[in-house]
Amino acid sequence: MYSLNQEIKAFSRNNLRKQCTRVTTLTGKKIIETWKDARIHVVEEVEPSSGGGCGYVQDLSSDLQVGVIKPWLLLGSQDAAHDLDTLKKNKVTHILNVAYGVENAFLSDFTYKSISILDLPETNILSYFPECFEFIEEAKRKDGVVLVHCNAGVSRAAAIVIGFLMNSEQTSFTSAFSLVKNARPSICPNSGFMEQLRTYQEGKESNKCDRIQENSS
């Protein structure tokens, strides 16, 4: 039977495009995540970037838009996660932070889980699914509302939410992606995450076929 562990082990980083990602922490510190020589490099950015290196255009405006995937499952950016009024307006009780170097702002007000994930195509996003899914399910069991966020709420957090829907609702990648895109139009998981999500679907379809064969034998 083709399991999630097999999917994770079989996934190859070698064919994916390299890139770098900037993260802004709660204190305003800039962190650059890059992949070089088969290693992740995380450095603090001292000088403001003149642009071009990572194809990054700085946007100083706050992104407080929250995508309502389900009444109890929300997707957003670090700006939303750091805005108390936005969190209260959406009745958030749990916050899943999958950014790198982004602090949790209101520790006494919400239940947090932080998992540092680099927004690189080479990052094995599937390996983070089990603990992320468990936290989301825990919030649901407690009749809570969980916000999943990364830095921009575009790639990492979106991939986690898409994967969760594929797993919990046995839906296809296309259907899950469309649902999340409709709720938060800005989502755009990086190329590696997109490939892994498709691989995840293939594994689930293989498992379904195996179960059908077992039941018919």
Curated annotation (Swiss-Prot):
The active site is at 150 (phosphocysteine intermediate). Its EC number is 3.1.3.16, 3.1.3.48. Expressed in the heart, lung, liver, and pancreas. The expression level in the pancreas is the highest. The modification N-acetylmethionine is found at residue 1. GO terms for molecular function: JUN kinase phosphatase activity; MAP-kinase scaffold activity; mitogen-activated protein kinase kinase kinase binding; protein kinase activator activity; protein kinase inhibitor activity; protein serine/threonine phosphatase activity; protein tyrosine phosphatase activity; protein tyrosine/serine/threonine phosphatase activity. Residues 65-206 form the Tyrosine-protein phosphatase domain. Disulfide bonds: none annotated. One of its GO terms (biological process) is positive regulation of JNK cascade. GO terms for cellular component: cytoplasm. It catalyses: O-phospho-L-tyrosyl-[protein] + H2O = L-tyrosyl-[protein] + phosphate; O-phospho-L-seryl-[protein] + H2O = L-seryl-[protein] + phosphate; O-phospho-L-threonyl-[protein] + H2O = L-threonyl-[protein] + phosphate. Phosphatase activity is enhanced by Ca(2+) and Mn(2+). InterPro entries: Dual-sp_phosphatase_cat-dom (IPR000340), Prot-tyrosine_phosphatase-like (IPR029021), Tyr_Pase_dom (IPR000387), TYR_PHOSPHATASE_DUAL_dom (IPR020422). SMART domains: DSPc. Keywords: Acetylation, Hydrolase, Protein phosphatase. Has a dual specificity toward Ser/Thr and Tyr-containing proteins. Belongs to the protein-tyrosine phosphatase family. Non-receptor class dual specificity subfamily. This is Dual specificity protein phosphatase 19. The gene is DUSP19.
